């Protein structure tokens, strides 16, 4: 039986996600702050019409979201799939060229914030796009691919994904995986460990720490398993996509960041109908208490809509053969994801209540990512940066208010 038949009447996720009320001050803070999200929506999986993407990104711009790490490829996608996906995105964005800035450095993100355009930061959630050819990594850098996940859920030449590990197989990082990491480090592309099995991820972190000490790596969209494991609603084994405290602490040691996803089905056992600002704040707060405010980001991991996701899961059964975990979560109502434009201002109010300062939130919403971007993409470590990040943010904000007030 197809997964589509198992989930009748599946409705849009983020498109119909709840808009949460927020104070005027919080709404303005989001507009005044560089905010960098993350969405997991290749064409045909998340969005299927150009207007769909434009509407989503216009809502984000209106709310003050500066930019997004946008997923071009995942799972077992090939080089040819990557080229097709980039064409789909670029051709749609070419319809409104003034709305988009394609990011190769932090300066591009700052320019997008000043102008009120969308900063486009490409990512790939799989290394299978290389088609076995390491020389393609250099081309990825020129294309603006900012980060790469080695293995998505299942097993490939680099190692084992989180679902494979959940099902009992995680043999760790392979020589091919190490060879890819060498090329990522060589060309300044961030190693992303979300979707990766724990042993494979730990092996990758060991390799990075040994061969490239001081180069940060990240979990771009992963929830903390520890937030849910002791709750009454928790499932016996937890969600296979969530990470351990040990993994998060390793990222801190590298100087990287961890961003929680606002995806409802990964909120083990809770599986809300609509993720609340309080629940989103809980995710952020957990990581801040664990690894510190300098190593936490945000990543809605939005899919635009879950309808194509169900079809994708049906066509790629091995990637989602999880003992019905995801389907049980869907059946429980957790079919959505917190869309940043609809929830972030309310999350801001909640974090203010918990004692977070504006400086803290500026780091979490975008500053920590930009520090890692600058270090990996541009080779400028924080201690070697001639401009203090706070001074840099103030310069950007002054320019925005002078030339593009909103």
Locate each region found by the language model.
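Bacterial N-terminal signal peptides
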Residues: 1-8
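N-terminal hydrophobic targeting/anchoring segments and the immediately downstream early-domain regions
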Residues: 9-167, 186, 209, 217, ...
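Loop-centered beta-sheet repeat module
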Residues: 170-206, 211, 215-222
């Amino acid at each position: 039986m197809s997964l589509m038949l198992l989930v009748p009447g599946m409705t849009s996720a983020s498109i119909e996600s709840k808009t949460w009320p927020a104070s005027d001050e919080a709404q303005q803070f989001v507009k005044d702050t560089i905010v960098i999200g993350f969405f997991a929506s290749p064409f045909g999986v998340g969005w299927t019409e150009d207007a769909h993407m434009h509407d989503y990104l216009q809502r984000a711009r209106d709310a003050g979201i500066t930019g997004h790490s946008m997923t071009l490829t995942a799972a077992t996608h090939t080089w040819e799939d990557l080229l097709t996906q980039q064409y789909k995105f670029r051709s749609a964005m070419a319809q409104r060229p003034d709305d988009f800035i394609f990011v190769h450095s932090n300066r591009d993100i700052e320019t997008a914030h000043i102008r009120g355009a969308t900063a486009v930061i490409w990512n790939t959630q799989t290394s299978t796009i290389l088609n076995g050819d390491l020389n393609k990594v250099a081309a990825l850098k020129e294309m603006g691919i900012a980060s790469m996940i080695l293995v998505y859920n299942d097993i490939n030449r680099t190692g084992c994904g989180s679902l494979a590990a959940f099902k009992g197989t995680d043999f760790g990082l392979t020589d091919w995986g190490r060879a890819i990491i060498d090329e990522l480090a060589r060309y300044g592309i961030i190693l992303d460990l979300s979707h990766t099995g724990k042993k494979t991820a730990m092996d990758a972190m060991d390799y990075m720490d040994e061969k490239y000490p001081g180069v940060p790596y990240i979990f771009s969209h992963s929830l903390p398993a520890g937030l849910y494991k002791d709750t009454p609603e928790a499932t016996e084994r937890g969600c296979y996509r969530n990470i351990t405290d040990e993994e998060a602490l390793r990222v801190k040691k590298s100087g990287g960041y961890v961003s929680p996803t606002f995806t409802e089905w990964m909120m083990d056992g809770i599986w809300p109908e609509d993720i609340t600002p309080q629940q989103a704040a809980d995710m952020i707060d957990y990581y801040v208490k664990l690894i510190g405010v300098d190593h936490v980001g945000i990543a809605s991991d939005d899919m635009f809509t879950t309808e194509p996701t169900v079809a994708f899961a049906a066509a790629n059964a091995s990637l989602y053969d999880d003992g019905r975990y995801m389907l049980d979560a869907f059946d429980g109502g957790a079919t959505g994801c917190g869309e940043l434009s609809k929830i972030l201002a309310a999350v801001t109010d909640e974090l203010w209540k918990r004692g977070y300062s504006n400086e803290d939130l500026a780091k979490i919403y975008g500053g920590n990512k930009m520090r890692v971007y600058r270090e990996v993409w541009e080779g400028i470590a924080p201690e070697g940066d001639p401009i203090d990040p706070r001074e840099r943010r103030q310069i950007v904000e002054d320019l925005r208010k002078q030339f593009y007030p909103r």
